[in-house]
Amino acid sequence: MELMAKPTFSIEVSQYGTTDLPATEKASSSSSSFETTNEEGVEESGLSRIWSGQTADYSSDSSSIGTPGDSEEDEEESENENDDVSSKELGLRGLASMSSLEDSLPSKRGLSNHYKGKSKSFGNLGEIGSVKEVAKQENPLNKRRRLQICNKLARKSFYSWQNPKSMPLLPVNEDEDDDDEDDDEEDLKSGFDENKSSSDEEGVKKVVVRKGSFKNRAYKSRSCFALSDLIEEEDDDDDQ
């Protein structure tokens, strides 16, 4: 009988077959063996599996990519809200006392009273188109009342006003003037009577009349004239 020698690779296979191979090597060996048996069918199935896995991975990645973005936006919004809240708290802590101080300032109170009801308040100056928009329209009733008050005050001040530069008016003593005029008339009458009675005493009475006229003229101002002065001057002219 003839003995057939066994190939050497069979022994190696038996030796390596006893050892446990890792899962990755088993998968690679199985895939390679599967590809050798049926090249066309195996390659198509393997590619289909690979592409399906990749698409699954990509789909999972895409789904996972959308969620982290949303979470990041939510986190940013929450951080902004927290920052706003913290800034408001800090502002309230720091400026709560300042608001009362600003209200108590006399300058601010004076300005608020001065511009109260006269101008509009704009939060943004860019909203103002022209200067006319700043002025606030006045109520016609208030305007009429204000004008009436101004007219009353103007009338009172006009009648009660005195010019300090002008000299005060001196009172005129009318009684003294009347007495002087009476004396002049008596002197004239006595002079006429004496002229009729005697011619010697005529010159003396004329001198008395002239002295009286000069006396009255000394007391009276040059700017004031009376009818008695004209009569005296006419009499003097007639006598001369």
Swiss-Prot record:
GO BP terms in the entry: positive regulation of DNA-templated transcription; response to cadmium ion; response to oxidative stress
Residue ranges, compositional bias (Acidic residues): 70-84, 173-187
Site label Critical for interaction with HDA19, positions: S213
Matches recorded under InterPro entries: OxStress_Response_Reg
Keywords, in A-Z order: Activator, Nucleus, Phosphoprotein, Stress response, Transcription, Transcription regulation
Locus of motif Nuclear localization signal: 142-150
Comp. bias (Basic and acidic residues): 188-205
Recorded GO CC terms: nucleus
Ranges of compositional bias, category Polar residues: 51-66
Compartments where located: Nucleus
Modified residues (Phosphoserine): S213
Record-annotated membrane-spanning stretches: none
Region span, Kinase-inducible domain (KID): 202-229
Record comment regarding domains: The kinase-inducible domain (KID, 202-229) is required for interaction with HDA19.
Function: Transcription activator which may regulates gene expression through interaction with the histone deacetylase HDA19. Promotes slightly the tolerance to cadmium (Cd) and to oxidizing chemicals (e.g. diamide and tert-butyl hydroperoxide (t-BOOH)).
Subunit-level organization: Interacts with HDA19; Ser-213 is critical for this interaction.
Listed name of the protein: Protein OXIDATIVE STRESS 3 LIKE 4
Gene expressing this chain: O3L4
